[in-house]
Amino acid sequence: MIRKNFNIKELIKPGLILGPLLAIHWVTMFESIELNSIAVGIGLVFSYPLFVLLLEFLRGNKPKSYQVFLISIGFIGLYFLLDISNINSLEGIFYGLISAISLSLIIVIGEKFSSQLGGLKVAFSQLLVASIILIKFTYESREWLIDNLAVSIFLGFFLTGVGLTTY
């Protein structure tokens, strides 16, 4: 699937733009989770539709009323699911919002590249660049990765790989 019409040069630009954004997204998401809780960190990350809507508006695309309605309903549900009393750190909230903003930038910017080059190719290039950026941290925890190889493969293949094939 990747080899068909595969030109590495055309993937450099999306990789260099989206890869660092993906690395920022990952680091800030996990930092938010560490400073607060999984529920608060993931809840903040899932505020990204609001930022996608805002970015699209800034690009001149007027949101449809049903989109605003559905996102509003989603945020009301998110409010009820989040346990506000678990918010321990304003810094964690900041990291969660940065994670959501970087994810929304990946979606908005990546849409153009994906329509031209294909989503799988773009995902490959951004994952490659993000992996290179974060390799130092992976190297420092290589013993954990080796001890937990099955978990690492599951997280890498199923959660990341399968998730990205839908995008």
Regions found by a protein language model. Give the residues of each.
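Transmembrane alpha-helical segments that form core, pore/gating elements
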Residues: 1, 52-53, 85-141
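C-terminal transmembrane-helix exit sites in multi-pass transporters
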Residues: 2-5, 29-31, 47-69
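Residue-level recognition of pore/gate-forming positions within transmembrane alpha-helices
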Residues: 46-50, 71-74, 78, 100, ...
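Hydrophobic core positions of alpha-helical segments in small-molecule transporters
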Residues: 17, 44, 66-69, 91, ...
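Helix-capping/transition residues at the boundaries of transmembrane alpha-helices
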Residues: 33-35, 60, 114
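Hydrophobic transmembrane alpha-helices of multi-pass small-molecule transport proteins
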Residues: 17-20, 63-83, 134
